[in-house]
Amino acid sequence: MTAKVYINGIGAVTAQGIWRPEIFSEAKALQQGISPADYPNYRDLIPGAALRRMSTGVKMGCYAAKQALLAADQETVEAIITGTGLGCSIDSDKFLQQIWANDEQYLTPTAFIQSTHNTVAAQLALLLGCKGYNMTYVNGASSFESACLDALLQLQAGELGQVLLGAVDEIATQTYEFLRLAGRIKPDVFPYAEGACFFSLATQRKASSCAELVDVELCNQLTTADLGLFVSNFLARQGLQTEDMDALMLGYTGNVQDDAYYAALEEILPHAQALQYKPLSGQYDTCSAFGLAAAAYILKQQEVPPVLYRDLQQRQSRPDRWKYLLLYHQYGGKDHTLLLLRVC
């Protein structure tokens, strides 16, 4: 029998501050350009000696992870699984600049060592004393969902009982400029940001449980015409139909190519309430982790914060109970992912 998987704790460092009960009541839409995270006092959760050696992304990740474990009343973890689009890109920039400035000679290895994509997961293992399964996924816009799928499969199969799942990406000046010049990001259209979101997943339900993570699906390429079949097949796997979805968590950005997919999904599920999260999180490779946190919050509280509505003036009648929520993410017409949550 497949085990159920619950989100027992959430932690985050975002442009809206840290994860907290009032995060959505205090949230404001980000402005165009670069939106760095609202950094907390890291010493509240991370020892000072360890903190001094951490880069921005590692600090955000470790803080969010500790926060998620505290929320779940969990002190130890069996496994750590993370996703990141660009890894510790600040240190990557630093190392490449040193190569250029020193004509590829007399380089110290520190920045290179700290720039690897699995640095956050490795630092968490040291911080938490976890000697178990440790994996980092780097798959562009589906990096977090790839990590999520790994965690879900292992928990459902009974290979693990508890997993620390997370995602982190940071803003690096040089990398940001490269992405802008390549047309990958358009800060004049939508804010480019950073953040870390972590989740304590377990097969045991607790009082702190926010929602049940039911299923995850990934597909590299789709047309808007293929989207309906992609979604219906995904739901059918769980014995569900499109009419069973109470809400959609979407990633509108103002980019015509991206938004066409989200608009198409709204047409496929016209009865589901359309919600959005990117005006609060900003755009970065693993921002969908914030969308998952927002979706879990809704199912836990049985209330949709006004700031999450796609169109507050056209919101639909509230269901008797928010039961199923579907999170859909893609970027540039590629890396399409679906995450299904159920109230617990």
Placement of each model-derived feature along the sequence:
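Alpha-to-beta junction loops
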Residues: 159-161
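Short-chain dehydrogenase/reductase
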Residues: 148
